[in-house]
């Protein structure tokens, strides 16, 4: 199991206890975060590539730990994502010699093990944030978060996640996703098929809706993309920069996941004007306006019928996609996301 029992830090606090916060801070209209105070040096890990890419739109420098041969979690600056100059590859052997302003943890092992292996004592006393990407696994409502520290900040990526986790005494806030709008990519939908984009679906089981996908694919034409998609008869991985244009030709985007955080792939599909068909679970229930920007339901039979309707009516699909794009650009604007993260970093560092 990924989760362990709650861990109480034994490090001395770096300052006064943080004030509990909830809800995402909103960007002030007309405020340019590039003109704010000095750039901060943030140490973090390459945990989710697309999230890291959007995170680096914040006006700071991000140092990502790397190991030889780039094993999972230690890829550093790698892959096909068009990283900016503010993402700096940092070998773990060099971390203790660096000066940082803040440590951003994104996984239990990073907090429980890596900081003691690769950071010096002074670095471990720096302001710290734990970014929780996931819903609680072992129990949906009664699972205590493993970070138990009134001097850290726990960031959840959706209001649903924050609701379900027992965050204990750790101060929390929600920073909802943000995504960039691809230049020159717009929904076409000429291909009478649906698209599913999930990594490693074959080995992630019922939680990610592998069985739901297979039943839906038996009823309507669906293509699966993502890492190891070939194992389930899919098309394989599409590079992040090419995925929007590739997805735009499909009639709709199908999200079969039962229980997880709101996927960035859904938001990216909405950004280009794709209608969404999804299970009405987790944060998805607040994102899709049923019958307006797509269709959500807990009945697989109903969702299959809706997918068939979209395959038969291209214009209706386009109308739903237009509404999905408006929602995405209002709620998941990258400028708001970057401003929220800038505010979080400056809150813990008091800079």
Language-model regions, residue ranges each:
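Conserved acidic donor-binding segment of nucleotide-sugar-dependent glycosyltransferases
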Residues: 19, 290-301, 309-315
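A short hydrophobic beta-strand element within the catalytic core of glycosyltransferases
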Residues: 253-254
């Amino acid at each position: 199991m990924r989760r362990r029992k709650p861990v109480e830090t034994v490090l001395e606090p770096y300052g006064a206890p943080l004030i509990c916060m909830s809800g995402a801070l909103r960007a002030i209209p007309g405020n340019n975060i590039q003109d704010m105070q000095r750039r901060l040096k943030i140490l973090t890990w390459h945990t989710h590539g697309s999230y890291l890419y959007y995170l680096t739109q914040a006006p700071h420098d991000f140092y990502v730990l790397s190991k030889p041969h780039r094993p999972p979690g230690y890829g550093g600056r790698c892959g096909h994502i068009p990283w900016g100059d503010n993402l700096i590859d940092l070998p773990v052997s060099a971390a203790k010699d660096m000066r940082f302003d803040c440590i951003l943890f994104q996984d239990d092992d990073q907090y429980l093990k890596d900081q003691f292996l690769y950071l010096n004592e002074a670095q471990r006393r720096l302001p710290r944030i734990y970014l929780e990407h996931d819903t609680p696994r072992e129990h949906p409502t009664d699972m205590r978060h493993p970070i138990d520290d009134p001097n850290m900040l726990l960031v959840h990526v959706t209001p649903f996640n924050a609701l379900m986790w027992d965050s204990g005494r750790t101060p929390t806030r929600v920073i909802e996703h943000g995504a960039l709008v691809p230049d020159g990519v717009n929904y076409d939908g000429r291909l009478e098929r649906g698209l599913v984009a999930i990594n490693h679906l074959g080995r992630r089981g019922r939680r990610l809706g592998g069985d739901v996908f297979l039943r839906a694919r038996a009823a309507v034409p669906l293509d699966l993309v993502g890492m190891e998609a070939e194992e389930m008869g899919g098309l394989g991985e599409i590079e992040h920069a090419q995925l929007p244009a590739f997805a735009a030709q499909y009639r709709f985007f199908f999200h079969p996941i039962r229980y997880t955080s709101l996927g960035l792939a859904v938001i990216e599909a909405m950004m280009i004007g794709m209608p969404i068909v999804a299970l009405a679970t987790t944060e998805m229930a607040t994102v899709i306006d049923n019958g307006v920007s797509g269709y959500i339901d807990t009945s697989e039979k109903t969702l299959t019928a809706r997918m068939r309707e979209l395959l038969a009516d291209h214009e209706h699909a386009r109308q739903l996609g237009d509404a999905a794009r408006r929602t995405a650009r209002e709620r998941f604007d990258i400028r708001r996301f970057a401003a929220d993260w800038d505010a979080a970093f400056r809150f813990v560092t008091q800079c």
